[in-house]
């Protein structure tokens, strides 16, 4: 599989159909791969966050938090304990709640790249986020995953996926403290809220601080829009 510069990752858990469905439609979609973003009451960065960051952004299963974490499988390879020793793409593929993300990673030929990356932070849209995107832009997922250049590092799908990834590990306190992150795609990702309830470009974190072997994963309720080029 082709390894691209911007390494990328996509990973883990939570199927939150109910959670995402309940909070997913107040932000206008962007063309080319965005679902509606749920409104969040804590969209602005907080200067009062006192939660300390974990060293190197590496978290433990006891650090996992969020309103949808109870949707993560309790046992097996797709559980929090099952994912911690697997590289991020493998961890995602083991979770039946991240099937759309996994298919996108495979189509973009990014699996080996993600698994071999030394350190990543991944903002992983759950299946309902992709369903919302498809509802707003019928046929978009097929268009992205079957494009002639889909396996190219410059394909639209690769750019969308790598926009959800950062080439360094951060925990929730770390991303909020940073306020803005450089994605592997190259564009900035804006972080708001607090360490207990962060937002990613305004989208809520549904389950965060999920550790895999080489990444810290945040399951989010929206497919992030690529900024205008």
Regions found by a protein language model. Give the residues of each.
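Mature, structured domains of secreted/extracytosolic soluble proteins
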Residues: 2-229
């Amino acid at each position: 599989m082709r390894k691209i510069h911007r390494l990328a990752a996509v990973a883990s858990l939570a199927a939150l159909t109910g959670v995402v469905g309940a909070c997913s439609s107040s932000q206008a979609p962007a063309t080319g791969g965005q679902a509606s973003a749920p409104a969040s009451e804590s969209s602005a960065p907080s200067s009062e966050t006192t939660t300390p960051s974990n060293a190197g952004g590496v978290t433990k299963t006891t650090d996992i938090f969020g309103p949808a974490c109870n949707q993560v499988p309790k046992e097996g390879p797709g559980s929090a304990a099952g994912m911690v020793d697997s590289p991020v793409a493998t961890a995602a593929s083991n979770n039946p709640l991240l099937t759309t993300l996994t298919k996108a990673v495979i189509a973009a030929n990014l699996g080996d790249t993600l698994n071999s990356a030394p350190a990543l932070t991944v903002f992983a849209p759950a299946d309902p986020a992709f369903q919302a995107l498809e509802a707003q832009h019928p046929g978009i997922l097929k268009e992205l995953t079957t494009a002639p250049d889909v396996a190219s590092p410059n394909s639209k799908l690769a750019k969308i996926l790598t926009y959800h990834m950062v080439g360094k590990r951060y925990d929730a306190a770390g991303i909020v403290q940073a306020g803005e992150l450089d994605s592997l795609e190259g564009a900035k990702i804006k972080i708001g809220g607090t360490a207990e309830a962060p937002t990613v470009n305004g989208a809520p974190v549904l389950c965060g601080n999920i550790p895999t072997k080489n990444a810290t994963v945040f399951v989010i309720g929206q497919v992030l829009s690529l900024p205008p080029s």
